[in-house]
Design a protein with these regions (language model features):
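An anion/pyrophosphate-binding glycine-rich loop and adjacent beta-alpha core
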Residues: 1-56, 108, 117-123, 127
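Glycine- and aromatic-enriched mobile tails/lids
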Residues: 11-14, 64, 70-84, 88-262
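FAD/FMN-dependent oxidoreductases across multiple families
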Residues: 38-83
């Protein structure tokens, strides 16, 4: 079996060339499929497909994010007392791609280190009164009471999330090019102004991903630019994005990002 990024890229290119919304996996030759892959069998049966006798529709899906909050190998960030572990973190252990099961090992190693550091930090810091916590919560709630209007219903949120998913999958998915990314960037600007405040953080993250993909004019690891199909040795670095006090997204390049511990 080829690595996931190669399989996903092949499927995405097939869908792009044919205009179909999936590729087809023929597993009918595998004996006792339901015993070897019970979860897949159950999922297929829920949509009326018998994988023992019928082809299975497949398409790439977002699975793992190689980037994330910049941390060191102990889960520490540049925010004092804030630790990040797992898929939300960028430790640098994966590079531009990820080998299968590496994320599990990363979580076990870094996750095993964080508790001792957190306890050590708590022992050297003072306590916060319950009154101070409740007061901060009330102030924050009052400051954002108009962020979620009465019309912000579960149906509306599902509709907004679906629109965002379709845009990101279609334009910023497995295969990318400048035209698709620029179109996505423009639409994300509009969505940020029109979607409910509840979606703002998600849209901001989508904007950062899109901007990062536009700036990286090469193909490297899990990032595939159809208009730049080869790696560029001059771009062997990472980009660190942040939200400035002016509300704008800023970025800087560095070879091996590490948090500025304080």
């Amino acid at each position: 079996l080829a690595p996931r990024d190669i399989v996903a890229r092949s499927i995405a290119l097939h869908m792009r060339e044919t205009g179909e919304n999936c590729a087809w996996l023929d597993a009918t030759h595998i004996d006792h499929f339901h015993e070897r892959f019970p979860t897949v069998t159950e999922g297929c049966q829920e949509i009326g497909i018998d994988p023992q006798t019928q082809r299975i529709p497949i398409a790439p899906a977002a699975h793992y994010q190689s980037g994330g909050i910049v941390t060191d190998a102990y889960g520490r960030t540049d925010v004092p007392g804030l630790f990040a572990v797992g898929e939300c973190a960028r430790t640098g252990l994966h590079g531009a791609n990820r080998l299968a099961s590496n994320s599990l090992l990363e979580g076990l190693v870094v996750g095993g280190r964080v508790p001792a550091l957190a306890v050590q930090r708590c022992q050297t810091r003072g306590t916060i009164s319950r009154h101070a916590i409740e007061s901060a919560w009330r102030n924050d709630t009052a400051a954002h009471q108009h962020d979620f209007p009465l019309g912000d219903t579960p149906v509306q949120r599902r509709r907004e999330r679906r629109a965002l998913q379709q845009l990101m999958s279609g334009n910023v998915g497995v295969t990318r090019d400048a035209a698709l990314l620029q179109e996505a960037a423009q639409q994300l600007e509009t969505l940020y102004e029109t979607l409910s405040r509840r979606m703002h953080d998600t849209v901001q993250l989508c904007r950062i991903i899109t901007e990062a993909a536009l700036l990286r004019t090469e193909t490297r690891g899990g990032h595939t630019r159809l208009d730049y199909p080869k790696p560029d040795p001059q771009q062997r670095y990472s980009r660190v994005f942040s939200l400035g006090d002016d509300g704008k997204i800023h970025h800087e390049t560095c070879v091996n990002p590490r948090p500025q511990l304080r």
